[in-house]
């Protein structure tokens, strides 16, 4: 993530970073846990969680997952302190500085806990604070809040209306694009008939479920789980009304970038995984709207496992444990073991040279 921020800032112009604060818990590992090299851990990996129970909250929209309790953050603090103490026994680094940075990190977590109403908000607040500490100055916004702004809803609804009206064409366009993926490298899921690029968090359980289109006479019914929403003619006006009624519960799916492009976003920074989707998104954009995909900047790197924490584990075990062979330094790792100037330089070199 930091390399993308650095690349985005280097581009200049009116750039911003949007937090997808509505993703379902468990859909990506980084939302469920943070992994760090640890001398004391059985496999060399310390796994931190910021929610009480992954099993209980699995699949829930992050806006509906409770914020971390104070007791949970206290356990995180103790584990991080122990990690630093153990590492200092096996390698040379400024332990007192690491403890000071840990106190600063934890102060940010506590502030985020006080201000947040959900895990999604906690992640956004804590991350934005840390990014600011590292000197990143571009705006950080909640994607769900941005897309729900009254002045943007007409464009969102207009684009959604096209997706619904041309739902068969969307399925066809996705299949056409995926026909080029002979080696199965896109990791893009084919879309079924009635696909709508919209998801809804369950009113009772907060589970994020995709909506699908079912026609009933002239009415367009959007169905998810046990809930059905009548979008009427599914024109822009009726969809604005529907989105306003579902405020705080709806979110866009993998086609979200196309909605942003239609709003006027003129470029995007992607990583190794997300840039592959551009083949499909670009084809859908052309078939559906007759427009080209906006410019992409691939910003990614695969650095070797490194840093004081890795050095400590290797020294203690006589080599790199299998669980850490694909480890990429997290921002927490960097922040605890380096000064801000060093971190920014490592980040700058990483995305320009492809590795640190």
Residue ranges of predicted features:
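N-terminal targeting/trafficking signals and adjacent low-complexity tails
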Residues: 1-3, 7-356
């Amino acid at each position: 993530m930091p390399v993308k921020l650095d690349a985005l800032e280097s581009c200049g112009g009116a750039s911003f970073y949007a937090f997808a604060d509505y993703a379902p818990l468990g859909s990506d590992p980084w939302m469920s846990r943070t992994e760090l090299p640890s001398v004391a851990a059985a496999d060399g990996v310390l796994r931190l969680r910021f929610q009480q129970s992954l099993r209980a909250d699995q699949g829930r929209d992050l806006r509906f997952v409770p914020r971390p309790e104070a007791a949970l953050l206290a356990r995180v603090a103790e584990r991080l302190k122990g990690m630093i103490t153990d590492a200092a026994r096996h390698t040379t680094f400024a332990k007192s500085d690491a403890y000071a940075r840990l106190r600063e990190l934890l102060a940010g977590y506590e502030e985020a806990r006080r201000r947040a109403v959900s895990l999604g908000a906690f992640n956004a607040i804590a991350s934005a604070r840390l990014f600011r500490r590292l000197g990143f100055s571009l705006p950080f916004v909640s994607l769900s809040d941005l897309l729900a702004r009254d002045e943007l809803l007409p464009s969102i609804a207009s684009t959604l209306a096209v997706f619904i009206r041309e739902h068969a064409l969307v399925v066809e366009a996705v299949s056409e694009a995926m026909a080029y993926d002979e080696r199965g490298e896109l990791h893009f899921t084919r879309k079924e008939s009635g696909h709508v690029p919209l998801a809804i968090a369950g009113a009772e359980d907060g589970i994020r479920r995709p909506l699908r289109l079912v026609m009933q006479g002239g009415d367009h019914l959007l169905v998810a789980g046990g809930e059905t929403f009548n979008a009427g003619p599914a024109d822009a006006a009726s969809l604005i009304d529907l989105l306003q009624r579902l405020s705080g519960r709806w979110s866009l799916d993998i086609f979200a970038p196309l909605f942003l492009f239609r709003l006027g976003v003129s470029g995007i920074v992607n990583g190794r995984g997300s840039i592959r989707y551009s083949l499909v998104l670009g084809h859908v954009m052309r078939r559906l709207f007759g427009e080209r995909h906006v410019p992409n900047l691939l910003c990614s790197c695969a650095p070797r496992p490194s840093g004081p924490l890795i050095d400590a584990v290797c020294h203690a075990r006589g080599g790199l444990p299998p669980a850490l062979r694909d480890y990429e330094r997290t921002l927490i790792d960097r922040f605890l073991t380096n000064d801000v100037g060093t971190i920014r330089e490592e980040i700058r070199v990483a995305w320009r040279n492809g590795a640190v």
